[in-house]
A protein has these predicted regions:
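Conserved pre-motif I regulatory segment
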Residues: 3-59
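Long, largely alpha-helical accessory region at the distal end of helicase-like NTP-driven motors
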Residues: 459-525
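Conserved RecA-like P-loop NTPase helicase motor core
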Residues: 386-475
Length: 525
């Protein structure tokens, strides 16, 4: 029989708010050891000096344990004020991975139910558990969290892999209409004369399906914005329009539009993040970031001050985490070309887990011909589970996945980064074509490459070999001007790789000379 008098007389248990103490008290699994030195130092610094900061950037090297740091910060703030705490990931794959990490460390979290994806978990709303979900759940025109004044109040929010999240946020404001959609033809017809006057030859190529790019003249766009609105509003349930239209419908004059033979893109010149009050009005906004990234969007997009961006929370004594060896095969010997490397590492006799990152599905065809596995968002989890079960004979291919995929330890011992990344959207592509070689475009490419290099080494004891193939990427990384924009760690790894190239070239030359001398001696006899 329950004695309710004891329950009524019991004092509420005091909740710890020091993140180090919280971690010590968690019911962790046996393989979850103590905090790493970096995690310990960062959390102590945050608790002592930065926990009152509304806007905070946490900058650490890839594989330093940012996920656990973010979860412990949220748990600390949840224990302190009891307000809803939200942990946002770039994609569903990382949502599942973060939930597994939380379970491993004994942190109480919740997710959207698979049975009812349209109901926000009550444990999150009541401040009992941290909600882990993908960035698209919050940032879209039909968000369950509400837009403008009608939004769910959130106490604290963490953006994990914040630069990958930024790409998703920008995408949420964009309308992308494919050529086979009736809207494509209607919009093309609306601006046909304007495009013809601008570049009639390119327009003809676009009509024939060319990937060439034109921007719709801004004066024509503004003049015809009402006709554009009428066309888009007539298709409210079209999946290319549905989730972005509520965000753009009253500000088309502040948008820009681009057209190719494959589709049309409409995107805002400035992303009105303020529409998402759950994020912009949160008491604490914590962005987890790698040390190599361009942080300009934190200012112009999220409203962070320059001072907040210039003073991130870092580990002042951090060292390199894990071991990477970068190799440039084509610089050692021209016979070690891109296609020869694909053929070599596609050999199923190689019983080592290996992945290749390619910029497009078109370029993945070379792998498909060799029997490799080209992953998509639905198959990636299964591929990694197969690797963990010992099935490591296949080379797996990630298409344009330079971020949002973590491949620690035996998940990936050989990582191939194939060719220079390409732009995800037409506005970035247009900027790159107009400002080729500018610092802005170089930084964007460097950021993508650095993100790709960080997929395979995720911890202090982790290691992998990274193979760089594709002449455009090799030239970009070896060019003194563009190489200067990489992080100090990557620049050092490129320097070591270059020394190795010179050493191996000399060995090959010496070996060839020795063989030639042997032939000469044999000729004498």
């Amino acid at each position: 029989m329950i004695d309710f008098s004891k329950k009524l007389g019991a004092k509420p248990k005091e909740k710890k708010i020091n993140p180090i103490e919280i971690y010590s008290s968690l019911d962790r699994k046996t393989d979850a050891g103590p905090l790493r030195p970096t995690q310990d130092r960062v959390l102590q610094d945050w608790d002592a000096n930065r926990r009152k900061d509304r806007n905070l950037i946490v900058k650490l090297h890839t594989g330093e344990g940012k996920t656990l740091i973010g979860l412990l910060m949220l748990q600390s703030l949840l224990n302190e004020n009891g307000e809803p705490c939200l942990y946002l990931c770039p994609n569903d794959y990382l949502v599942e991975q973060t939930c597994r990490e939380a379970e491993k460390f004994g942190i109480n979290v919740c997710q959207f139910s698979q049975l009812d994806k349209y109901v926000i978990p009550v444990d999150f709303l009541n401040g009992k558990k941290i909600l882990i979900t993908n960035i698209q759940k919050l940032f879209n025109g039909k968000t369950l969290f509400g837009i403008n004044a009608n939004c769910v109040k959130i106490g604290s929010v963490v953006l994990d892999d914040s630069h990958a999240c930024i790409d998703s946020i920008k995408s949420s404001f964009s309308i992308r209409i494919k050529k086979d959609n009736d809207l494509y033809g209607q919009l093309l017809q609306l601006f046909y004369d304007d495009l013809k006057e601008q570049a009639y030859g390119t327009l003809i190529s676009i009509e024939q399906g060319s990937s060439e790019l034109l921007q719709i003249p801004y004066w024509a766009w503004i003049k015809k914005k009402e006709e554009v609105a009428r066309l888009l509003a007539s298709q409210p349930d079209d999946m290319s329009v549905k989730f972005a239209w509520p965000l753009l419908k009253d500000s088309l004059e502040d948008c820009q539009s681009f057209i190719t033979g494959n589709g049309i893109e409409i995107s805002p010149i400035y992303c009105p993040i303020e529409k998402f009050g759950s994020f912009t009005k949160a008491a604490h906004r914590i962005l987890m970031s790698a040390t190599t990234q361009d942080d300009s969007f934190f200012i112009k997009g999220f409203g962070f001050t320059a001072n907040e961006v210039q003073q991130p929370l870092t580990d002042k004594v951090q060292k390199w985490s894990g071991e990477k060896m970068i190799l440039f095969p084509s610089l050692i010997d021209e016979k070690l070309s891109r296609l020869s490397m694909i053929k070599l590492f596609s050999n199923e006799k190689i019983a080592v887990s290996r992945f290749s990152i390619v910029p497009s599905f078109y370029m993945s065809q070379d792998y498909h011909y060799e029997g490799c596995v080209v992953a998509n968002k639905n198959s990636l989890n299964g591929i990694i589970e197969n690797i963990r079960r010992g099935q490591r004979n296949k080379l797996n291919v990630l298409v344009n996945r330079y971020d949002g995929v973590n491949l620690p330890d035996n998940d990936c011992r050989i990582l191939i980064v194939d060719s220079l990344p390409i732009c995800d959207n037409l506005s970035d592509r247009y900027e790159m074509e107009c400002r080729e070689g500018s610092e802005v475009t170089i930084l964007k490419q460097v950021q993508k490459i650095e993100q790709g290099l960080g997929r395979s080494v995720r911890g202090e004891k982790d290691y992998s070999v990274i193979i760089i193939i594709g002449s455009d990427l090799v030239n970009f990384m070896m060019n003194h001007r563009t190489a200067s924009y990489f992080s100090p760690q990557t620049k050092k790894q490129i320097e070591i790789a270059n020394e190795l190239v010179e050493s191996l070239r000399q060995e090959i030359l010496d070996s060839a000379r020795a063989d030639a001398l042997k032939c000469v001696r044999l000729q004498k006899f």
